A protein has these predicted regions:
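NAD(P)-dependent Rossmann-like dehydrogenase/reductase catalytic/cofactor-binding core
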Residues: 102, 109-113, 138-148, 152-236
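Internal alpha-helical scaffold of NAD(P)-dependent oxidoreductase catalytic cores
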Residues: 4, 32-42, 59-146
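Catalytic cores of large soluble enzymes that bind and process phosphate-bearing ligands
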Residues: 25, 67, 118, 125, ...
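General beta-strand structural signal in soluble alpha/beta enzymes
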Residues: 13, 41-46, 86-90, 149, ...
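Glycine-rich beta-alpha junction loops
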Residues: 18, 46-52, 68, 90-94, ...
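Glycine/charged-rich beta-loop-alpha catalytic/anionic-binding loops adjacent to active sites
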Residues: 9-11, 89, 175-177
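Rossmann-like NAD(P)(H) cofactor-binding subdomain of soluble oxidoreductases
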Residues: 1-57, 75-77
Length: 236
């Protein structure tokens, strides 16, 4: 990017995930990008959106987040359309975290559906997944309203809503014993990095850890589900 974007050129991050890091275990995209893109204002464009629905001009709401209020306002103005609403925010870490964690939780939701555990279980899983997201966000200094907004809850609900979600489809295949889809499931690669970062931060993410054990650790699904369900339930 530095070769094509002169210093002072805004860079908008649209990807969702983490980058492995030898010190912290993993970095969220703004953390990784800042030292590599010095002198270039950063922003994130994120939220609950399936690309094909955006292309079909179906109503969509996204978040433009930047440390610089003028940049988030500029992005919102440039990309807004009759069917595309862009809200503005300043919490880039919260926006990046929500987009990364939801991919892992969506795999768990898919496994839940593939195992035939029911709608009650899926609702509980999504809610507790949001709680895990909020715990890590608090540790990293993110804003709680970001996690309860489009980049957090909004993206999580969409990604856990059905097979249209690549990560949920991947989890469903695992849970039902069917061939794993060849399409990219970002959560598959994010799970281990997220686990490493959360351990660095001393934050426990039971659902995310379970997904990593199943996807990358070759742990039996039934064994891991039983372990999750046997955990003591504390204060919500």
């Amino acid at each position: 990017i530095n070769s094509f974007a002169p210093v002072g050129t805004p860079v908008v991050l649209c990807a969702k995930g983490l980058v492995s890091d030898p010190h912290k275990g993993g970095l969220f995209l703004p953390e990784y990008a800042r030292p590599h893109l010095k002198g270039r204002p950063l922003a994130m464009l994120t939220g609950p959106s399936f690309a094909d629905e955006v292309l079909r001009d179906l109503p969509t709401a996204l978040l433009a987040a930047s440390d610089t209020a003028t940049l988030s306002a500029q992005i919102a103005a440039q990309f807004s359309a009759s069917s595309l609403r862009l809200y503005q925010g300043s919490d880039m870490i919260g926006a990046a975290l929500g987009g990364a964690v939801k991919n892992v939780i969506a795999i768990a939701a898919g496994i839940c559906a593939g195992q035939g555990l029911g709608d009650n279980a899926r609702a509980g899983l999504i809610t507790r997944g949001l709680a895990e997201t909020a715990r890590l966000a608090s540790q990293l200094g993110a804003e709680s309203h970001t996690i309860s907004g489009l980049a957090g809850m909004g993206d999580l609900v969409l990604s856990c809503s059905g097979p249209h979600s690549r990560n949920m489809a991947f989890g469903f295949a695992l849970g039902s014993g069917k061939p794993v889809p060849k399409s990219l499931a970002e959560g598959r690669f994010s799970a281990s990095i997220l686990k490493a970062r959360s351990k660095y931060e001393y934050v426990e993410l039971p659902i995310c850890f379970a997904v990593d054990d199943i996807v990358n650790g070759d742990v039996d699904i039934h064994t891991r589900i039983s372990a999750l369900l046997s955990r003591q339930a504390g204060q919500e």
